[in-house]
């Protein structure tokens, strides 16, 4: 009897972390990830400034589990191109996409000096899709809006899109991918291998857009 109880307790303890993750709300996911990321950044910022690879590994470790990289990659390619891609091409694009995005946008995190971040309650949570807003205070004191779209995938909420300061990142990258495919004569490998340059162009386009602050 004791042996059965012990085994039952071990099973319960092993399953508890999974139950905890599954029970997280969209707000919990965004708030928890933000808190962990900023805590790690505060402790290791100087190291990350001199070691970009360590910074990428940290971002991937913290953000990877809560980002729907597969869904985002297919969305950027759109059905037109993703259905033609081999599993190897999709995997390569995912890796190039994640690394280039974190490299180009990670610099903004290194410049963050605890000015202030507020995560709003989730909106339109129907159990499958939800939106979570965030307000980020810049160095100049202005407050910028960020909007996360999350989807429930297998009982876990994962980020599917982000709107930063009024700029829809998913749409921006979709347009950039389609334009690159045109310029590359529909050569999927060439577009995938040159994706870092496309992210740089997208970032420049975003940087040149008018700023939208929260009043």
Curated annotation (Swiss-Prot):
Pfam families: MlaC. Residues 1-22 form the signal peptide. Keywords: Periplasm, Signal. GO terms for cellular component: periplasmic space. It comes from the Bacteria. It is found in: Periplasm. Its main location: periplasm. Plays a role in toluene resistance. Belongs to the MlaC/ttg2D family. This is Toluene tolerance protein ttg2D. It comes from Pseudomonas putida. The lineage of its organism: Bacteria, Pseudomonadati, Pseudomonadota, Gammaproteobacteria, Pseudomonadales.
